[in-house]
C-alpha cells in the first residue's frame, strides 16, 4: 500500500503527469500497461510504485517542463503544446531549454488553432493583421505571427479563451481544438492551424544517477513496446502452402510471417503474423478467398522488438 507521508527516495525515478485534464487517464493507463502498480488516494499528489522504484507526481501540466528542466523529476508526460510554449518562454528569458523530448506518444492529439467568429471573413494569415487574438499560448502564437510578418495584439488569458470575442476582449482566439464542438458552441470556426500537438515523453537534462539508469532504460523500453503495438493485431490461420504468396500480400503492415507445418498435412501450414495496421472484415474475407481457414485475430498488448 502506498504511504502518502513517505519521503522521496533519491534513487527512485520520479515521473510527472497532469493532475487532472485530458492527458491524465491516458498517461496513467500507459504507466499501468508498462507494469507499474500503485495506489492513489483522493487528492494525493504523489504515488509510490509498489513493484518498481518509480514515483508518480500529479501536477499542473504547464509545471511539468519546469520540474523536468530543474531535475525535480526525471521524466514527464505532457502535451507537445506545453513543451513548445515552455521552450519559447525559456528562450525569451535567455534560458536554454535543456529537457529532451524522448518520444511522441499515441494519445492526446489536438491542434492549436486560430479560430474566428462565424461572421468574420478570413482570407488567410494576413487577415490577422492588426487584430486582437486571445490565447493561453502567447509564445507559440507570437512566433507564428512573427514568422509571417504579422503585427497583431496578443491578449493573454489563463482560461475560457473561447468567450473572449463575445466579451469584447479580443477579435479572434488561438486555442486547443480536439473535436471543434466547443468552438461551435461559442459561434467560432477553425481558420488556421498553428501547431499539431500530441502527448510526449520528456527527460531531464541532468545525467541520471547510476542507480536509476537501469530502470530508466527498462521503463523507456516498455513504453516503446506499448506504443509500438497500438492498433496492432496478431493473426493466426491455416492455409495451403501454395497460397502463402497471396496471403503475405494481404496481411496489412506485417513483417515476414511465421510459417509452421501442420502435423500430418504436408500441403497445409499454420501462419502467424503481427499486423501493425488495422485488420478489417474485408481483409479476413480476402484471406478466406485465397484459401485461409481457422482465421483468428487477437489484440497485441505489448511487444519488445
Task: Describe the function of each predicted region.
Residues 66, 111-115:
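Signature of uroporphyrinogen-III synthase
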Residues 53-75:
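Short, structured active-site "lid" loops
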Residues 2-54, 78-106, 111, 120-305:
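Small-molecule-sensing regulatory modules
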Amino acid at each position: 500500500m502506498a504511504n502518502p507521508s513517505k519521503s522521496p527516495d533519491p534513487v527512485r525515478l520520479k515521473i510527472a503527469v497532469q493532475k487532472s485534464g485530458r492527458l491524465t487517464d491516458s498517461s496513467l493507463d500507459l504507466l499501468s500497461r508498462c507494469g507499474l502498480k500503485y495506489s492513489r488516494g483522493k487528492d494525493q499528489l504523489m504515488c509510490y510504485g509498489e513493484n518498481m522504484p518509480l514515483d508518480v507526481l500529479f501536477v499542473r501540466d504547464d509545471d511539468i517542463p519546469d520540474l523536468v528542466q530543474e531535475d525535480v523529476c526525471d521524466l514527464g508526460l505532457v502535451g507537445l503544446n506545453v513543451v513548445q510554449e515552455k521552450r519559447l518562454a525559456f528562450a525569451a528569458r535567455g534560458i536554454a531549454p535543456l529537457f529532451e523530448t524522448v518520444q511522441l506518444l499515441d494519445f492526446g492529439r489536438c491542434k492549436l488553432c486560430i479560430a474566428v467568429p462565424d461572421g468574420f471573413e478570413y482570407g488567410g494569415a494576413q487577415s490577422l493583421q492588426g487584430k486582437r487574438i486571445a490565447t493561453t499560448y502567447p509564445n507559440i502564437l507570437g512566433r507564428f505571427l512573427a514568422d509571417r510578418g504579422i503585427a497583431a495584439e496578443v491578449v493573454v488569458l489563463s482560461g475560457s479563451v473561447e468567450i473572449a470575442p463575445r466579451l469584447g476582449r479580443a477579435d479572434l482566439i488561438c486555442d486547443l481544438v480536439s473535436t471543434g464542438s466547443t468552438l461551435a458552441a461559442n459561434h467560432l470556426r477553425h481558420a488556421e492551424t498553428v501547431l499539431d500537438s500530441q502527448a510526449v515523453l520528456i527527460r531531464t537534462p541532468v545525467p541520471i544517477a547510476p542507480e536509476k539508469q537501469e530502470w530508466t532504460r527498462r521503463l523507456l523500453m516498455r513504453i516503446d513496446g506499448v506504443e509500438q503495438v497500438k492498433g496492432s493485431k496478431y493473426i493466426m490461420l491455416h492455409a495451403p502452402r501454395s497460397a502463402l504468396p497471396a496471403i503475405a500480400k494481404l496481411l496489412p503492415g506485417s513483417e515476414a510471417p511465421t510459417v509452421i507445418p501442420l502435423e500430418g498435412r504436408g500441403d497445409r501450414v499454420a501462419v502467424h503474423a503481427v499486423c501493425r495496421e488495422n485488420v478489417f472484415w474485408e481483409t479476413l474475407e480476402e484471406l478466406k478467398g485465397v484459401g485461409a481457414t481457422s482465421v483468428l485475430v487477437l489484440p497485441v498488448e505489448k511487444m519488445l522488438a
